[in-house]
Amino acid sequence: MLFTSHIFNCLLCCLLFLPQSRDTLPSGSARAMILEKPSRSGGCLHAYEPLDTLFSSTPDGYEPFYISHFGRHGSRYAGSKEDFSVIDELMKYSSRNHADSQKSSVDPASNSMEAAESRKVTLSETGEQLLSDLIALKEYSEGKYGQLTEKGAREHRNISRRMCSHYPQVFSNPERKRVIAVSTTSGRAIASKENFLSQLALNAPDREVSSYTARDTLEYPAAVLATSGYPMSKEVRRNERFPDTSESTARLMKGFDSRRLRSLLFVSNCNDSILATNGRDTALGHVTSLSKSSLADSIDDSIFIRIQFSGRHYECIGDTLVPNFEKYFTVEELYYLWTVETLIWYAHSCACEGADHTRMHYYGAGILKTIIDEADSAIAGNSVAANLRFSHDTYLYPLLALMGVEGADYQGPAIGALDRVIDFTNVCTAGNVQLIFYKKQAAQANQPDVLVKILKNEKEVLIPSLAPSAGCYYDWQDLKNYFIQRIAVF
């Protein structure tokens, strides 16, 4: 949640000086995906999209015996009331606020200059509806900030159910009855784990489940390393180095034209001539649609990113009573707002040129080391069928980047990541990576003892820089050596 807030602050900085010229909307896979489903513009708050994936055939002579899983918590409520701070900003322009001030014993003339100016600009009918929708979303979230929603609980129950369905051999082996599950101490991560395990108990009732949090280091020494990697000191955090994405953002955001939103959400209550959205000076009368000129200049473009940031929490709730906020934006506007966030995610968490890759080194390496060690123990013959880890996007993204999996493997300037490293395909709510281990059932000459395939959000993926043994299956020794090399490099 802290990193999400940091991204939000970066977004606001990037939007302070947006140019107002419109460019042609770029083509590309991310744009096409958002066009297909606008809610994907929510980035890390986009809800999990289960896929009815057709898995590759299991290689002859092999059978799955062990699963290593690392997942983000499911859909959650907004982190705090600060996620709805834009409501206070919009209230300055709301007719309900002006009516309240008239009823007040305080002389309206004594109000601040800011309040007086806001009365010259008010919310349109659509703007008032938007404000009502935001208030409704905030009220729906109060008392539940940061908690897992029922939608998030379903996401993890369904992932658990599909895991048991796809790999019944793993959860029916009498010699491997143990399942070890661990989460961070966050309530939403714990609740995600509990929902996953409740479904597992229905589908594989004879498994012996050990459930831990990161506090339980006496019972499970790797509890912290498995869920959040190596701890970062305050000094390390202070000295993290990230490339400046503001120039790239400024170029991208030329396509974001706030005039339509200004005209949609605000009106000017004056006799001034206001620049119309078609760019011509037009006397529009006493009440005019608002565009970026005259009184409209008092409204900063950052208010629109605040609206989108607050409104996108609706998808995590999944209740029909909660309004859909995408109706206020065009797909183009959603796309451009999304590009800023995904660039910041890449610059901070992945193998971005100019970064020191601190999060890959601390978070990613610690988790990946645990994955390797626990897999080797399972291969050596312990009784564990699955290691399940429940954590956060802050740790999942660096892990995926360090592993070099398809869709998170790009190394280069941030601007090149737009269609290569897409946040809603990597760290959506309940996002996960699973390593499925297959053991050779009989002696076969020149065949690896253990094969592994990698799933990202339950879809088979490759590591572009490492050749598989066959299809999407890797020789575990090759994959392990590759991971160890990546840890050493980063």
Place the predicted regions along the sequence by residue.
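Signature for phosphate-centric chemistry
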Residues: D23-I180, T184-N387, S391-F490
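Bacterial Sec-dependent N-terminal signal peptides
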Residues: M1-P26
